[in-house]
Amino acid sequence: MAKLTKDELIEAFKEMTLIELSEFVKEFEEVFEVTAAAPVAVAAAGAAGGEAAAAEEKDEFDVVLEDAGAKKIGVIKVVRELVSGLGLKEAKELVEGAPKAILEGANKDDAEAAKAKLEEAGAKVTLK
């Protein structure tokens, strides 16, 4: 197998959908027995280090779809609105694969607005 350069890998990733990239990351973590959650652990350790860190307000949120509820079609429509470039099939897979992060690293206002839209559509949502 020919060795791919970093640029070739990046170009291949650009052509993948969000769902495909998510599945790739999960498989990568399993094959190499690593986790992409290290930054979260570092942030948690930093917050435990002092009162100043605890006083800071969190400015980035992940909007996590816990359950689509009974009105799955409405939730799929809202997910397509929130995630740009997401096709119907990808949105459906994302909703059916709950719990899944819909938005990652969103500011507080966007995260709360997305949560409100999803809950209005009948979904159960958490902010992390």
UniProtKB/Swiss-Prot annotation:
The answer to keyword Ribonucleoprotein applying to this record is yes
Entry keyword set: Ribonucleoprotein, Ribosomal protein
What InterPro entries does the database record attribute to this sequence?
A: Ribosomal_bL12, Ribosomal_bL12_C, Ribosomal_bL12_C/ClpS-like, Ribosomal_bL12_oligo, Ribosomal_bL12_oligo_N_sf
Pfam families of this UniProt entry? Ribosomal_L12, Ribosomal_L12_N
Q: Which GO terms describe its biological process?
A: translation
Q: Which Gene3D superfamilies match?
A: 3.30.1390.10, Single helix bin (1.20.5.710)
Q: Which GO terms describe its molecular function?
A: mRNA binding; structural constituent of ribosome
Q: Name one GO cellular component term.
A: cytosolic large ribosomal subunit
Report whether Lyase shows up as a keyword of the record: no
Q: Which family does it belong to?
A: Belongs to the bacterial ribosomal protein bL12 family.
Q: How does it assemble?
A: Homodimer. Part of the ribosomal stalk of the 50S ribosomal subunit. Forms a multimeric L10(L12)X complex, where L10 forms an elongated spine to which 2 to 4 L12 dimers bind in a sequential fashion. Binds GTP-bound translation factors.
Q: Which PANTHER family match?
A: 39S RIBOSOMAL PROTEIN L12 (PTHR45987), LARGE RIBOSOMAL SUBUNIT PROTEIN BL12M (PTHR45987:SF4)
Function, please? Answer: Forms part of the ribosomal stalk which helps the ribosome interact with GTP-bound translation factors. Is thus essential for accurate translation.
Please identify the protein, giving its name as recorded. Answer: Large ribosomal subunit protein bL12
Source organism of the structure: Corynebacterium efficiens (strain DSM 44549 / YS-314 / AJ 12310 / JCM 11189 / NBRC 100395)
Q: Which gene holds the coding sequence for this protein?
A: rplL
